Amino acid sequence: MKDMPLRIHVLLGLAITTLVQAVDKKVDCPRLCTCEIRPWFTPRSIYMEASTVDCNDLGLLTFPARLPANTQILLLQTNNIAKIEYSTDFPVNLTGLDLSQNNLSSVTNINVKKMPQLLSVYLEENKLTELPEKCLSELSNLQELYINHNLLSTISPGAFIGLHNLLRLHLNSNRLQMINSKWFDALPNLEILMIGENPIIRIKDMNFKPLINLRSLVIAGINLTEIPDNALVGLENLESISFYDNRLIKVPHVALQKVVNLKFLDLNKNPINRIRRGDFSNMLHLKELGINNMPELISIDSLAVDNLPDLRKIEATNNPRLSYIHPNAFFRLPKLESLMLNSNALSALYHGTIESLPNLKEISIHSNPIRCDCVIRWMNMNKTNIRFMEPDSLFCVDPPEFQGQNVRQVHFRDMMEICLPLIAPESFPSNLNVEAGSYVSFHCRATAEPQPEIYWITPSGQKLLPNTLTDKFYVHSEGTLDINGVTPKEGGLYTCIATNLVGADLKSVMIKVDGSFPQDNNGSLNIKIRDIQANSVLVSWKASSKILKSSVKWTAFVKTENSHAAQSARIPSDVKVYNLTHLNPSTEYKICIDIPTIYQKNRKKCVNVTTKGLHPDQKEYEKNNTTTLMACLGGLLGIIGVICLISCLSPEMNCDGGHSYVRNYLQKPTFALGELYPPLINLWEAGKEKSTSLKVKATVIGLPTNMS
């Protein structure tokens, strides 16, 4: 009982002390501000609960005169503070200071000598124009400095002296026009540098060499057109780099090869037109690759992504012109799990592309104009366990009979095993005006089974095969045509032709040089009959092909009193010989060639020719053949009739089913009519590019009355 008064006095003393501290705390907290304990993450991402004074968005004109002594985080964002005066009352434990969105115009107006424990300083969206020498040297413990979205145009070489513990530096969205490697001499421990969205003219070799511990570099939105080969030398610990939203026209593969520990690469939103062979190769630690939102990207070529043993994900989405991925584009990627190819212009994806990725688990190819034919049959043949992402958004665009259907619902047996080449319409423009002396490239790619061969035809009719190199032209093995030093003589129509054993496709581009075509020379057109047989005529022609459109059309008309038959084909302008077949013996034909020009004029010429008559031995041979053929057909029909009769008599079979079978059998020819004629005939009868044609017409003038 004697201890009871003592206990009461102790408890009363504690209560009074707590009350006094609470009153002091309330008195110390600046007017209108909020003072409380809040969660906070240090620059090292360590969680802590910090004493926070929140004075954001209060319209303050000056720095608070008095703060609680235990303040660790001070938030002064969105005020009108223009200067921080020296004070002896700065909290000694202040580690975070946010002065974003104020009126600070000079770092010299920020007196921070009494804040040695600061770890993070935010000066975003102020009016700072320069960083003079040693301007923040008192902040020896500073780890984060945000000066983005200011008006910085000048940074002195020694501006960051004293900040040897700095880990993160944000300088993006200022007015810097160059990067000085001397800035970084005082920052040996810097891990993250963001310097994008500045009007930097160029990056120089060794620009970042002092940053030996840098792990992340963001150089986004500064209109870079190239990266020097040695620009990234010295960044041995760099793991992530972003060149987002620049003007790179090709992958800076030489510079990237020198970042040996790179894991994440962002090249999104650059006008790169091709991912070429070796662009991403032998990058042993790369895990993720981003090539999204590239407005000019057309193709990913053979072995473009090769020997990346740790790569897990490729994102190549929202590229409006990406229409071709080579079957061997992705090679030696043993750990690739995710392939994102949605929202491009892909009509197909080769099975070989998928087969080369042994660990692939998911693929996204929806929102592409898929052509449901031979190339994508594999998707529905149950030959893969890969998960298709958003399969309900995967639709056929061609052919017409499958248009609008879900790709995964079209049975693979309904798709042909081989198919015509298709050159993507996005490959290159139909018309282009260039300046004399300029350099241009046209990227022609086509999908088909079997894989097509690609070549080009010049306005002069010259045929340029892959790997052809001349003074003016170079055709890459993938189908790209380079024209060097364009002159008015190189103006005219250039045609890319993709062909395989099924047929061909072509796409042309009309080039004007300084807004005009080559001068019209009113060239002539000559026709020559080179060979005449009973059932064929070999015709050749010679024209001033400089002014020809680079496609031709041949039409043969056969007239009798009661019949009219026509055959047609269109072939490249480099072909000046054509064999008219399936003609009648001893028949006079009128063969006409009609050539439209780039000046919308026509060259037309006709010749008359009579096919040879049949030799008596040939007549007898044909007669015997006809008799034999009729006998075979009669026998075949007899066998079919017996089968039908047996089918009708059988109680287990339906007679109507037999009739249906015969009817279907007779309606389906056992061979394609296209096999009787050159492959281009059926292709061009559909009327594609009818305006760019050369017509060869053969019309019957006299038909013999006695063929025996």
From Swiss-Prot:
The UniProt transmembrane annotation reads 629-649
Q: Which residues form the Fibronectin type-III domain?
A: 523-617
Side Cytoplasmic, residues: 650-708
Supply the Gene3D superfamilies for this chain: Immunoglobulins (2.60.40.10), Ribonuclease Inhibitor (3.80.10.10)
Q: Which InterPro entries match?
A: Cys-rich_flank_reg_C (IPR000483), FN3_dom (IPR003961), FN3_sf (IPR036116), Ig-like_dom (IPR007110), Ig-like_dom_sf (IPR036179), Ig-like_fold (IPR013783), Ig_I-set (IPR013098), Ig_sub (IPR003599)
* Top-level division of the source organism's lineage: Eukaryota
UniProt repeat feature LRR, residue ranges: 70-91, 93-114, 117-138, 141-162, 165-186, 189-210, 213-234, 237-258, 261-282, 285-304, 310-332, 335-358
Task: Tell me which GO cellular component terms the UniProt record holds.
Answer: extracellular matrix; extracellular space; membrane
Q: Extracellular side: which ranges?
A: 23-628
Q: Which residues are glycosylated?
A: N93, N103, N223, N382, N522, N579, N608, N624, N625
The signal peptide annotation in the UniProt record is: 1-22
Q: How does it sit in the membrane?
A: Single-pass type I membrane protein
Q: Name one GO biological process term.
A: positive regulation of synapse assembly
Coiled-coil portions: none
Annotated SMART domains = IG (SM00409), IGc2 (SM00408), LRR_SD22 (SM00365), LRR_TYP (SM00369), LRRCT (SM00082), LRRNT (SM00013)
Q: Which Pfam families match?
A: fn3 (PF00041), I-set (PF07679), LRR_8 (PF13855)
Q: Which cysteines does the record link by disulfide bonds?
A: C444-C496
Predominant place of localization: membrane
Ig-like C2-type domain location is 421-514
Extract the CDD domains matched here.
FN3 (cd00063)
Q: Where is the LRRCT domain?
A: 368-421
Protein's cellular compartments? Membrane
Domain named LRRNT: which ranges? 23-69
The record's keywords, sorted A to Z, are: Disulfide bond, Glycoprotein, Immunoglobulin domain, Leucine-rich repeat, Membrane, Repeat, Signal, Transmembrane, Transmembrane helix
List the protein's name. Leucine-rich repeat neuronal protein 3
Q: Which organism is it from?
A: Homo sapiens (Human)
